Amino acid sequence: VVKQAMKLAREAVAGTDTLVALDIGPLGQLLEPTGTLKFEEAYELFKEIIDAGKSMADLIVIETMTDLYEIKAALLAAKENSSLPVFTYMTFEKNGRTFTGCSPAAMALTLEGLGADAVGVNCSLAPSELREIVKEISEWTTLPLVIKANAGLPDPITNEYSVSAEQFAEDYRFFAELGVKIYGGCWGTSPEYIVKVREMLRENPPKKRE
């Protein structure tokens, strides 16, 4: 599955300068001591994915993680079994921590120490709800920062998300001021959202972090 997915991605970007990422998410099992999956088993599962896709990838993205222990296993597997840049993102709750209780500061310090090439948040919340979380990450790492927020929450009747493309881009101004380097979107976003963000960034280039 991984090899075929990477092959299709390569075919889709042929003739362009678009980069292809080997995207890795959670395994779907909790690691010990919260769950039953051993750290070594998680490492081997991530290694299998990396070995299958690294030859066709320009970088590795590890995202939507809630457990610092699991993202540690994934990052170590990536760093020890490839020479590709590795971007690492976790997803946070409204209380400012991940589902398993990891703080933005702990995430930033740990992942930089393990050799990540960029850190950030994806999925999680709307842009306006991620301000303090990303700000805290920025205070604890010198790595490039990434944001891929949700477009708010979907309406249970219409299934439309609460943050429009225009508002999404406007809310991203905060992160440009903060010096976030890489921008994207998660649940509820579409190419229209990315176009609006790009237009905003042309007018408001990300500030250089000190």
Regions found by a protein language model. Name each.
Residues 1-210:
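Domain-level signal for soluble alpha/beta catalytic cores
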